[in-house]
A protein has these predicted regions:
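Hydrophobic, often amphipathic alpha-helical segments used for membrane interaction and targeting
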Residues: 81-228
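Proline-aspartate-enriched helix->loop->beta-strand connector
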Residues: 65-71
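N-terminal post-signal-peptidase region of extra-cytosolic proteins
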Residues: 46-58, 88-90
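Acidic/histidine-rich helix-loop elements
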Residues: 28-49
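Short catalytic/ligand-binding loop motif for oxyanion handling, primarily in non-cytosolic enzymes
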Residues: 28-31, 77-81, 124-128, 242-245
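A cross-kingdom marker for long, charged
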Residues: 206-268
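Short, well-ordered beta-to-alpha junction loops that form the rim of enzyme active sites
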Residues: 71-76, 120-121, 237-240
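Single conserved hydrophobic/aromatic residue that forms the stacking wall/gate
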Residues: 1-10, 14
């Protein structure tokens, strides 16, 4: 048989893992992202009206029936998450505000799924590390200024915040719209991405390569470590991560990416 025939046969036999990615706003509003949310615009997800809505969202996503749930929590925190989830199953832990627990724990309980931590920090080049090391230098301060007063400010795409007016479910549907995800990636290609310490250098591009692109590649690598026995994987991360993670899943021969809005928009 030809190499092409063997390759085709192997592809037919290989069963890709199904993946559902859910991009979220952070339910506990830590305000660590570029877009800050003022206290008056925040919601308390522990209030009865939002708890009822979160239960509905969890039940919709549980229809995917994941074997594994991947969450935005440091890889080194796996033992702590396992302990909290075990306590939750035993009725000895009250869920915190975070989407990790409000959605991740609920769905894992409903589907008897295993939870996996997958967050990581990106690595920077030695030159960028040196730049970030001392915030008293003019070079550092000029770089910081590129965040605050960027000539590209008018080009940034801001998330439309509708959770307070319309609810959590409409917000999640909006955040996971492919058009919105594509716009979001554009934010990482302007502003400080174009910053140059010296004319013609790549300070901004190198910084963003480590902070965002390398970080998400590492997250993807952590997800690849999920056991192959998991036929269906639900990934719950901040919505911005989907601008790279979804693309990686779409390109990978190991996974079949499904549309999360097909689940969120169902009436069940």
């Amino acid at each position: 048989r030809s190499t092409l025939d063997r390759s085709s046969a192997a592809s037919d036999v290989y069963k890709r893992q199904e993946v559902l990615t859910l991009g979220v706003f952070h339910f506990d509003f830590p305000n660590l992202d570029m877009q800050q949310i003022s206290e008056e615009d925040q919601i308390n997800v522990l209030s009865p009206v939002y708890q009822k809505e979160i239960e509905l969202i969890a039940s919709k996503l549980a229809n995917f029936n994941p074997d594994a749930i991947v969450i935005e929590h440091p890889l080194g925190g796996q033992q702590k998450i396992d302990s909290l989830f075990k306590a939750y199953l035993a009725g000895n832990h009250k869920l915190s505000k975070s989407e990790v627990q409000q959605l991740g724990f609920r769905i894992a309980k409903m589907c008897k799924a295993k939870i996996y931590c997958a967050d990581a920090r990106g690595t920077q080049t030695a030159r960028i590390e040196e730049l970030l090391e001392d915030d008293s230098t003019k070079q550092y301060q000029d770089f910081e200024e590129s965040f605050v007063n960027s000539p590209d400010s008018s080009l940034y795409s801001k998330d439309q915040l509708i959770f307070k007016q319309k609810g959590i479910l409409p917000q999640l549907i909006h955040l996971n719209d492919p058009r919105q995800i594509k716009k979001d990636l554009g934010n990482y290609l302007i502003g400080h991405f174009k910053y140059e310490s010296d004319k013609g250098d790549y300070t901004g591009a190198d910084f963003e390569s480590g902070r965002w692109f390398n970080r998400n590649l590492r997250i993807f690598r952590n997800i690849q470590r999920t056991p192959k026995s998991a036929k269906r994987i639900l990934v719950i991360f901040g919505a911005a991560h989907m601008n790279l993670l979804n693309y990686l899943f779409e390109c990978s021969p190991e996974y079949k990416l499904l549309n999360v809005n097909d689940y969120l928009k169902t009436n069940s």
